[in-house]
A protein has these predicted regions:
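Cell-envelope and extracellular/periplasmic
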Residues: 1-289
Length: 289
């Protein structure tokens, strides 16, 4: 399936090789089980090997065959997708890989049902000394998720950038994740809510020594407006100072800034929220994408 998507071919080739290797290893491990009859070893073998997105596609040896294919044809209202952590090593390819998978699921059911993506929350060690974590892969993975929500029919996302644990890939507090998914569904699927999705940057423009970001609705700043960074003429990132006024956020901190970013780290500082009662967080942003 992914071989049909040129941007994902390299990813597909690597995953195909990995799948073949896993099949060989599985045969060896099964033989070992028969000899040892060790329950502890059996339990370890049953552990998920990483939950890469391709295992959910419709190829051989995939999770699709045992867990999704049996229910194809049954009524479906939508899907919730909370995956992607194991794909962080190829964040740009993720939009093509997951995008192709969503299309294949839609084709199997014969309908473009809602596909709600949980944009991944914060994870890994904080690096407060860095204005921008330029080599971080999770911000780019979150950006790919946003691209899918914008470009794949039926896809949409919830933003969870203010949640997460440094040392636990699964946030302990699950309630906000579920609530935000519900808000998105109520707005996009059931049409009973006006603002269920996170605020989005509509426009970013340099005005003198500042960058002005215009969001799609009024926002407010918490946490002293932290999380913004500006790229100076020397190509160095510096912390930005942010002020909100209605739907605009003005960021200053360096003369004639070249670019602006927000929440661009694996575990970023965050401050931008919708001004409504639900106070939904805005996701990561970069002006250079």
């Amino acid at each position: 399936m992914y071989a049909d998507v040129p941007e994902a071919k390299d990813f597909d080739d690597k995953e195909a090789a990995a799948i073949k290797a896993r099949a060989v290893n599985l045969e060896k491990l099964q033989a070992r089980l028969k000899v040892e009859k060790d329950k502890v070893v059996a339990a370890k073998l049953r552990q998920d090997a990483g939950r890469l997105t391709p295992v959910w596609s419709n190829g051989p040896h995939m999770n699709w065959n045992g867990m999704v294919a049996p229910i194809v044809g049954y009524s479906v209202r939508g899907t919730i997708w909370y995956q992607g952590e194991s794909n962080a090593n190829q964040p740009e390819a993720y939009k093509w890989v997951l995008g192709a998978m969503i299309k294949s699921w839609h084709k199997s059911w014969g309908q473009e049902f809602p596909f709600l993506i949980v944009q991944l929350p914060r994870f890994m060690a904080r690096k407060p000394e860095l204005a921008v974590e330029d080599d971080a892969t999770w911000p780019r993975l979150r950006e790919s998720m946003e691209w899918i929500a914008d470009n794949i029919p039926g896809a949409m996302q919830s933003v969870n950038i203010d949640l997460g644990e440094e040392k636990d890939i699964h946030p302990k507090d699950k309630l906000p994740v579920g609530e935000r998914l519900a808000y998105v569904a109520l707005q996009r699927v059931y049409k009973t809510r006006t603002d269920g999705e996170a605020p989005r940057v509509k426009k970013a423009e340099r005005q003198g020594d500042a960058f002005v970001l215009t969001y799609d609705r009024p926002v407010l700043l918490k946490n002293d407006g932290k999380g913004f960074a500006l790229l100076g003429a020397d190509d160095k990132w510096v912390f930005g100072q942010a002020k909100a006024d209605g739907a605009t956020v003005t960021v200053t901190g360096v003369k004639a800034p070249k670019e602006v970013r927000y929440a661009w780290a694996n575990f970023p500082e965050v401050s931008v929220y919708s001004a409504g009662a639900d106070s939904l967080p805005a996701g990561p942003y970069r002006s250079s994408k």
